[in-house]
Structures are given as structure tokens and as C-alpha cells.
């Protein structure tokens, strides 16, 4: 009888542990989903054109330089105040929003550029965080 009571008690403890683990997993999944939705909403509320004006200017200038040089280009040129100011602006943007905002700017500028210039502009925008020495190192868009 004592043996049966011990087995039942052990089984009850195992059920409680399993139930608590399943509950924890469910809560974690919900929290991750809520965090992602919160980030997307927070990033949407920021205006890329206002927050990253110098980055927009830097990408536009890079595009103009490519056109003027007709194919002879230094793609990572960092001269001028717009690059430094762009890095300062990027550092002030929430890390989770940087790539979304850079993509918004780059896609708009790409629409105005043509062919190869547009692709090069996207590449530069993807690598801007790395050039500025901030995270994420590269944006995937």
C-alpha cells in the first residue's frame, strides 16, 4: 500500500511539472509574438524621412556621384558631413528599427534611380550600419 501511494504521489508530481512546463512554453510564445508586433508598431510610428534625413541625403549624393563618374566609383566614400550626420542619426534610432527605416529610404530613392544605380544604392543602405560601426552590421532587405 505504501508503495502504491508513493507511485501515485510521484505520478502526480510529474503531471504538475509537465503542466507547468507546457504553460510556460505557451506564455513565452505569446510574449515573443507580442514583442514583435510592438516593435513593428513602434517602427511604423517613426518617420524614416524625418529621423534619417542625413542618410537619405548621403544615399542621394552617392547616387549622383555614380552618375557623374559614369561607372568609376568608390562605393564606400565617406567624405562630407552627411555621412557623419547619418551615423549620428542611425545611432539615435532604436536598433530594431534601423533596417526598416533604411529600407524605406533606400526603396524610395531606388524608385527615382535607374538600373545599376538603384541596386548600388540598396547595397550601400544595407551596409550603412556596418560603415557606422553599429548593430546590426548588415540589413537584409
Swiss-Prot record:
Its main location: other. GO terms for cellular component: aleurone grain; storage vacuole. Disulfide bonds join 43-97, 55-86, 87-132, 99-139. Residues 23-35 form a propeptide. InterPro entries: Bifun_inhib/LTP/seed_sf, Bifunc_inhib/LTP/seed_store, Napin/2SS/CON. SUPFAM superfamilies: Bifunctional inhibitor/lipid-transfer protein/seed storage 2S albumin. It is found in: Vacuole, Aleurone grain; Vacuole. The mature protein consists of a small and a large chain linked by 2 disulfide bonds. This is a 2S seed storage protein. This is 2S seed storage albumin protein. The keyword Lipoprotein does not apply. GO terms for molecular function: nutrient reservoir activity. It comes from the Eukaryota. Belongs to the 2S seed storage albumins family. Residues 1-22 form the signal peptide. Keywords: Disulfide bond, Seed storage protein, Signal, Storage protein, Vacuole. Pfam families: Tryp_alpha_amyl (PF00234).
Amino acid at each position: 500500500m505504501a508503495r502504491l501511494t508513493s507511485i501515485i504521489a510521484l505520478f502526480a508530481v510529474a503531471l504538475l511539472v509537465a503542466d507547468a512546463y507546457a504553460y510556460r512554453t505557451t506564455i513565452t510564445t505569446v510574449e515573443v509574438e507580442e514583442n514583435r508586433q510592438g516593435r513593428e508598431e513602434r517602427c511604423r510610428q517613426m518617420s524614416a524621412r524625418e529621423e534619417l534625413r542625413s542618410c537619405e541625403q548621403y544615399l542621394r549624393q552617392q547616387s549622383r556621384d555614380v552618375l557623374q563618374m559614369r561607372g568609376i566609383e568608390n562605393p564606400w566614400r565617406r567624405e562630407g558631413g552627411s555621412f557623419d550626420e547619418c551615423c549620428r542619426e542611425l545611432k539615435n534610432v532604436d536598433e530594431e528599427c534601423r533596417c526598416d527605416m533604411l529600407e524605406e529610404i533606400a526603396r524610395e530613392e531606388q524608385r527615382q534611380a535607374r538600373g545599376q544605380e538603384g541596386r548600388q544604392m540598396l547595397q550601400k543602405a544595407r551596409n550603412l550600419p556596418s560603415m557606422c560601426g553599429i548593430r546590426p552590421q548588415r540589413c537584409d532587405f
